[in-house]
From Swiss-Prot:
Residues engaged in binding Mg(2+): D516, D522, E525, E526
Protein name: Phenylalanine--tRNA ligase beta subunit
Biological process annotations from GO: phenylalanyl-tRNA aminoacylation
Gene coding for it: pheT
Keywords noted in UniProt: Aminoacyl-tRNA synthetase, ATP-binding, Cytoplasm, Ligase, Magnesium, Metal-binding, Nucleotide-binding, Protein biosynthesis, RNA-binding, tRNA-binding
Cofactor: how bound: Binds 2 magnesium ions per tetramer.
Length: 961
């Protein structure tokens, strides 16, 4: 969000304030606070906030007290023992005048006596002050700024009469830095350096230096959203301030434009508008102090009169201007795209290697400026420039934004063009700048120039009172609506052809400076913004009941055996509320207590990220590329390998490189979950809503690794946005790469088509345990991310188990579905190394993502309290030798079935692969317990033998003794 610095005095030039209450008639119906002829900064911010603009006070006057103009009558130089040379000066100043017209004494206390420090009275007494000064850049007769005892300077410095170098200094001669008007502290401020000619001759001793140097002004910072480019100017903010207070607005732009022609411009790439004007006989010497001060408050450094005027008009009107040294232009001007390997030396000393998509203004010798961004040094205006070619253009906002980002150049001009500038003000802003150059730099305005504009008026929008009621939620009369829209510059007329007795229809044409007004919703927002948000009644929230269009997968079991491996059948979970805020909060606390760090990422991603990492519970494994995944990958405890009927499992060469194995197609996108694009994204490169939290976590990990934080275990809890088959008409969104107009009739129904579940995602990379003396370090591995999934299950009060699967964002063979109550709710595993490398991350990055709303619909957080066991347990180890292609989770399931109810717990504690055979040995820790009585060795051995017998019949397993 951009910030505009607005000097208060500059803003108030364009509005007509009145003493007392601002008029209550017209648009606003709420009671406004009192505004005087000169509203303070707080009043301005309050008014702007009422029409949707936030801000804060930036610069307050820090100078106070008797700060006046003095004339140096005489001085004596003295060299002291420390080698420093000082000047013992006699300075004539105007003494403060009391109400009885008698001067204050030299030792008066300004805090107890009031004084008028202006030179409004010719009877004011002039007196001479003795002042010690360490500067030497002034002469006898110079006018200087004197801070008398009792004045306060920036930084909390209080001026008093004190003894310095053996003399009583009755005040201080101030420098630029001490007054806050510059950075020069080497010498004092001489008014002859600030004012010239008639302005200097009118200054008298005793004049109020604060008013003379415009040091009593303050500035406010106003935040400008990307859709309100018109507000990036004093003119735009003044219009909003006048709107908020129902007072007249005075436009600073002239109505008459200057005739110009005869200059040939080759417009190979047609801009929206392009005007030029030749001005000659310029005296580019000194900028008036009032303009320097205003630019300073607006955050712009003074350069020279011509450049300052172009900057001044840009801040005033929002139209960027550029001045070329006309004598430096070779041949005719041309607006074109940059040539391959073309370079531009900019006015700030950089050399840019231009891209062929960059728009430039060039002459016969090459580029003169990067259009809409920055000028070049070859045609820059200097103090010796006598003839300038003034340019006011209007360019495509996207082109300017891309050029600015491409070269990392964020200028005042590019900030305005990227937000769209009113096409119709280019020529008027040019005329405004020409008038200022004529008045302040003695420029001679010629009729030589060029003019081009390509403007198409926005199409009218049909708006009814019913539309406003449907969007806003309350009723307004047609007169209120029309008055509100006219107040923001719209052309509004009644449309009797479409009106009915119940609904009155209007035809609304937005003004040229509001290209953001394109539909009914935009107009409704403006109506309520102008009328006042306090007119919206407070009502109890009513949520319509509807079935959530959620699909899942159910895994069926018959008689303790898998039916056709695992048979997938879509089901719709029962309608229950989604995961609550309290559940999300407790889950976050649980993960944080386990050592994970919570992060919050933006919900906006590019299309590639939206397609790659989508965690789809309806994902079809057959829709992805199935590369050779190598021999038996390591799968943690509880992961069941799933094979197609008739398949013998996973096969492939063992010597294939890991990255070669991981070349899965990452562009697969399920048709039921198209990415939802935004009409007006904050970042043009990230114009889609996320369908997974993993892309944001990958970017977060990259930022942390680039700053030296290499050991990460981070998580996020947030919404993802899953579109349905039909194109969504959600306000501001559309569910395809093309932008469709929003439907007014079924807005609510369209919003319901977008499934927005809460999900939780964990990402881990780096070291799980740091290497220390007597302790070996350990990297995060696949077991850690499965433990993270189990931590999520414990935080939700449910149990998860895992089924091996494939997903385009995960390593083949190192990915598993997360199953809860026979429903597929997410994925966990190792991120595809090629995908991790694209984010400059190491190969070993592990992640899991789980749909919390699905878990909530299945009934989570149902805690079951079990009776504490009263009988002792018996623990035994079991080692089985079996084929490499048999997953540990399958063995655990069979052993549980064979051992029966006596087996309380089993877990894998060791795995050994035989080098010369296709066999492996799995060692399990088994805990037996009888809830009713103490176990005997015979019963334990019998249960163990039954388990071995069943494992042998199922997998050909052999027990090692």
């Amino acid at each position: 969000m951009a910030v505009l610095r607005v000097p208060v005095s500059w803003l108030l030039e364009y509005v007509h304030t009145q003493t007392g209450f601002v008029g209550e008639t017209g648009i606003r119906s709420d009671t406004r606070r009192t505004h005087t002829d000169c509203p303070v900064a707080e009043d301005i911010l309050e008014s702007l906030l009422s029409v949707g603009f936030e801000g804060e006070i930036l610069d307050r006057p820090e100078l106070s007290g008797p700060i006046v103009v003095g004339r140096v009558l005489d001085f004596t130089e003295e060299v002291h023992s420390n080698g420093k040379t000082i000047r013992w000066c006699k300075v004539r100043v105007c003494a403060p005048v009391q109400p009885n017209n008698t001067p204050l004494s030299k030792d008066c206390n300004p805090s107890t006596q009031t004084g008028n420090f202006s030179n409004a009275d010719t009877n004011s007494a002039l007196e001479t002050r003795d002042i010690v000064c360490g500067a030497s850049n002034f002469s006898k007769g110079d006018l200087v700024v004197v801070t008398l005892p009792g004045s306060n300077l920036p930084g909390g410095f209080h001026v008093t009469a004190r003894k310095v170098y053996g003399h009583l200094s009755d005040g201080m001669i101030a420098s630029e830095k001490e007054l806050g008007v510059g950075d020069n502290h080497d010498g004092i401020l001489r008014l002859a350096e600030v004012f010239q000619g008639d302005e200097l001759s009118k200054i008298r001793e005793g004049d109020n230096a604060l008013e003379l140097l415009a040091l009593t002004d303050s500035a406010v910072a106003v935040s400008i959203t990307p859709d309100r480019g018109y507000a990036m100017s004093i003119r735009g903010i003044a219009r909003e301030y006048a709107l908020a207070n129902n007072i007249p607005f005075s436009d600073p732009l002239p109505d008459d434009v200057l005739p110009a022609g005869g200059l040939s411009i080759d417009l190979r790439c047609k801009p929206n508008a392009f005007f030029t004007l030749l001005i000659q006989e310029i005296e580019n010497n000194q900028t008036p102090q009032w303009m320097v001060r205003r630019l300073q408050l607006a955050g712009i450094r003074s350069v020279c009169p011509v450049v300052d005027i172009t900057n001044y008009v840009m801040v005033e009107t929002g139209q960027p201007l550029h001045a070329y040294d006309y004598d430096a232009i070779q041949g005719s001007l041309c607006v074109r795209t940059a040539d391959k390997k073309e370079t531009l030396d900019t006015i700030d000393g950089r050399r840019l290697e231009l891209h062929t998509d960059d728009l430039v203004v060039a002459d016969a010798n090459g580029a003169l400026s990067l259009a809409g961004v920055i000028g070049g040094s070859r045609s820059r205006v200097t103090s010796d420039t006598k003839r300038i070619l003034l340019e006011a253009g209007n360019f495509n906002p996207i082109d300017i934004s891309l050029s600015s980002r491409r070269h990392k150049l964020y200028t005042e001009a590019s900030a305005r063009f990227a937000r769209s500038v009113d096409i119709l003000i280019a020529q008027r802003a040019l005329a405004r700048a020409a008038e200022l150059i004529r008045d302040l730099a003695s420029g001679d305005i010629t009729e030589l120039g060029s003019a081009y504009i390509n403007y198409t008026q926005q199409s009218p929008i049909l708006l009814s009172t019913l539309d406003i009621e449907r969007v806003v939620g309350c009723c307004f009369t047609r007169e209120e609506i029309m008055s509100s829209l006219r107040a923001i510059g719209c052309d509004v007329s009644c449309d009797s052809d479409h009106s009915t007795p119940d609904t009155q229809v209007m035809l609304v044409t937005p003004p040229s400076f509001r290209p953001d007004l394109v539909n009914v919703q935009d107009l409704a927002e403006e109506v309520i913004r102008v009328i006042g948000f306090n007119r919206i009644p407070s009502l109890r929230l009513s949520v319509p009941h509807r079935e959530q269009p959620v699909q899942s997968q159910q895994y069926k079991l018959e008689n303790g055996k898998l039916e056709n491996g695992y048979t997938l059948s879509p089901v719709t979970p029962p309608r229950t509320p989604p995961v609550t805020f309290e559940q999300r909060r407790l889950l976050g606390q649980s993960l944080a207590a386990c050592g994970h760090v919570e992060v919050i990422c933006y919900p906006f991603v590019n299309l590639a990220a939206a397609g790659i990492c989508h965690i789809d519970v309806t994902h079809n494994p057959d829709s992805t590329h199935n590369p050779d995944s190598g021999s038996d990958p390591i799968i943690p405890t509880g992961v069941t390998r799933i094979t197609e009927p008739g398949s013998s499992g996973v096969s492939g060469p063992d010597n294939v490189d890991v990255k070669e194995k991981c070349s899965a197609d990452t562009s697969v996108e399920h048709p039921t979950t198209r990415a939802i694009s935004l009409h007006n994204p904050i970042d043009a490169t990230e114009g889609y809503l996320r369908r997974s939290l993993i892309p944001g976590l990958l970017q977060c990990a990259h930022r942390n690794l680039s700053r030296g934080l290499c050991d990460l275990s981070i998580f996020e809890i947030g919404r993802v946005f899953l579109g349905q088959l039909r194109t969504s008409n959600l306000i501001g969104c559309n569910s395809d790469s093309t932008c469709n107009a929003c439907s007014r009739k079924n807005t609510i129904e369209s919003m319901n088509e977008v499934y927005q579940p809460y999900t939780v995602s964990v990402l881990q990379t780096g070291s799980a345990i740091q290497k220390q003396p007597y302790t070996e370090g350990r990297k995060y591995d696949l077991a850690d991310v499965f433990d993270s999934a189990r931590q999520i299950a414990r935080g939700l009060g449910v149990d998860f188990h895992f089924v091996q699967d494939k997903h385009p964002a995960f390593h083949p063979g190192r990915c598993a579905k997360v199953i809860c109550k026979h429903h597929h709710i997410g994925y966990t595993g190792q991120i595809l190394p090629t995908l991790a490398n694209k984010h400059n991350l190491p190969d070993n990055v592990f992640a899991c993502e789980i749909n919390l709303d699905l878990v909530a619909q299945l009934g989570c957080s149902q805690e079951i309290v079990k009776t504490l066991p009263t009988s002792p347990a018996a623990t035994q180890h079991l080692t089985l030798t079996l084929g490499n292609n048999i997953a540990a989770a399958s063995v655990i399931s069979v052993v549980k079935e064979g051992a029966g109810e006596l087996l309380e717990d089993i877990r894998l504690i060791d795995e050994y692969k035989h080098e010369e055979s296709d066999k492996k040995s799995l060692t399990f820790a088994m805990r037996f317990r009888d809830k009713e009585k103490t176990l005997t060795a015979q019963r334990v051995n019998l249960a163990k033998e039954n388990a071995v017998r069943l494992a042998s019949s199922k997998f050909g397993a052999i027990m090692r003794r």
